[in-house]
């Protein structure tokens, strides 16, 4: 080979070297591009990944490596421009805060209740039972009192008894309080005191009649007249035994029927001391409870002189009251009546201790107006026309105490029946 001709081997080696220098960077760029495409596709496959989620448009150069899911999804043609597609990309869902979990033995909103002991529960149950019993007892109070029709008794006494409004009110009030319950620790002992003819025996008869009607058994009402059942000729011990037997029979029968009997004893001032001792024995705590569930009404003229003196001394207080001074006068009258009961109790207690356990009910003197009312009532009952003028003429024939411009009958209405019978 001639030295003057250039050799072709170095010329061929130079293009090879330059080709290798160009291909190597291109291959590196392709590898980087493929890796970027793979990373982007992985982000697309992850939930909530990247802003390109849901576009479905792979980057140029990444189509050869597209996942199978993108190839299988159908393609729909729309008139939306490519610029509008990114605006419809779904927003990322906000991550909700996780719920706070509580233990199963506790509550979410209420504090944990402290454990109560069994003793506290038993105490609450006991309080509930006692409260129920108290309410039941309160409801039964009216039921037991309604059996005796005390409202009807009060109306009957106010209609038939003249001049004794305070005594009638006190009798009904005491009976109403006592008859509110059936079981009692002590009996009710009413002592009606006053002079003759003021209505004590009349009230006793009205009480006996009313209780016979409401109890529907006359055997539960005992009327004992000392003048008739125990005259002076009879031995006091025999009278005492008879009284004890009759009272025992009545209270035993009433206990069997679960009712409260009524025992009316008239002319108690004529009773010998053994009978008063027997009556006092009925009130003792050691006696059977049968004797405690009863109403004893004692009618006596003892203390009549004390009542007469009190009425005559306080006659001016009973004058017609002015409307402006009604309350003060009523309070003064109540205080005077309380003083009268206290003085009667002091006088009667000296005679026998029986009166210390009694509720004293004083019967005052009747004025002329009350006596006229007695005459009119008796005349109507006997078939006469109750003329006011004629009744006043009959009342004028009686004796009266004249004090402070008022007239009080000496014998009350005791002579009214005999006077009307002479018509």
UniProtKB/Swiss-Prot annotation:
Phosphothreonine modification, residue list: 89
Keywords: ATP-binding, Membrane, Nucleotide-binding, Phosphoprotein, Transmembrane, Transmembrane helix
Sequence segments annotated as region (Disordered): 47-68
Protein name according to UniProt: Torsin-4A
Membrane-spanning residues: 122-138
Main location: membrane
Binding site for ATP: 194-201
The keyword Transmembrane belongs to this UniProt entry's keyword annotation: yes
GO cellular component terms given for this protein: endoplasmic reticulum lumen; extracellular region; membrane; nuclear envelope; platelet alpha granule lumen
Residues bearing the modification Phosphoserine: 63, 81, 106
InterPro entries per the UniProt record, alphabetical: AAA+_ATPase, P-loop_NTPase, Torsin
Gene: TOR4A
Entry's family note: Belongs to the ClpA/ClpB family. Torsin subfamily.
GO molecular function: ATP binding; ATP hydrolysis activity
Taxonomic source organism: Homo sapiens (Human)
Keyword S-adenosyl-L-methionine on entry: no
Bilayer topology annotation: Single-pass membrane protein
Cellular compartment(s): Membrane
């Amino acid at each position: 080979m001639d030295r003057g001709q250039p050799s072709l081997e170095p010329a061929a080696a130079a293009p090879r070297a330059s080709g290798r220098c160009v291909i190597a960077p291109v291959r590196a760029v392709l590898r980087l591009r493929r890796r970027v495409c793979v990373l982007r596709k992985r982000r697309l496959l992850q939930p909530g990944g990247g802003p390109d989620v849901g576009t479905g448009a792979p980057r140029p150069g990444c189509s050869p490596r597209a996942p199978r899911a993108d190839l299988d999804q159908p393609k729909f043609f729309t008139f939306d421009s490519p610029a509008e597609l990114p605006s419809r990309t779904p927003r990322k869902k906000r991550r909700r805060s996780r719920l706070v979990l509580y233990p199963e033995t506790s509550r979410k909103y209420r504090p944990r209740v402290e454990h109560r002991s069994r003793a506290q529960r038993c105490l609450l149950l006991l309080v509930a039972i006692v409260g129920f019993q108290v309410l039941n007892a309160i409801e039964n109070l009216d039921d037991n009192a309604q059996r005796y029709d005390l409202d009807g008794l009060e109306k009957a006494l106010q209609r038939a008894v003249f001049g004794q409004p305070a005594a009638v009110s006190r009798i009904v009030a005491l009976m109403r309080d006592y008859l509110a319950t059936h079981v009692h620790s002590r009996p009710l002992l009413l002592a009606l005191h006053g002079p003759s003819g003021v209505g004590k025996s009349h009230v006793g008869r009205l009480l006996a009649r009313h209780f016979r009607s409401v109890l529907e058994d006359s055997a539960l009402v005992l009327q004992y007249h000392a003048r008739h059942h125990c005259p002076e000729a009879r031995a006091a011990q025999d009278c005492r035994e008879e009284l004890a037997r009759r009272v025992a029979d009545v209270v035993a029968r009433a206990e069997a029927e679960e009712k409260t009997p009524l025992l009316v004893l008239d002319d108690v001032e004529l009773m010998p001391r053994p009978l008063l001792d027997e009556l006092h024995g009925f009130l003792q705590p050691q006696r059977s409870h049968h004797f405690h569930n009863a109403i004893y009404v004692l009618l006596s003229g003892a203390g009549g002189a004390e009542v007469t003196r009190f009425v005559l001394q306080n006659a001016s207080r009973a004058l017609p009251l002015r409307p402006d001074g009604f309350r003060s006068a009523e309070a003064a009258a109540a205080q005077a009546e309380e003083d009268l009961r206290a003085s009667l109790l002091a006088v009667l207690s000296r005679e026998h201790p029986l009166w210390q356990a009694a509720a004293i009910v004083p019967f005052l003197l009747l004025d002329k107006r009350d006596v006229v009312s007695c005459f009119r009532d008796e005349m109507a009952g006997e078939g006469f026309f109750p003329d006011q003028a004629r009744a006043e003429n009959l009342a004028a024939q009686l004796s009266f105490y004249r004090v402070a411009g008022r007239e009080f009958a000496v014998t009350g209405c005791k002579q009214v029946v005999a006077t009307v019978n002479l018509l």
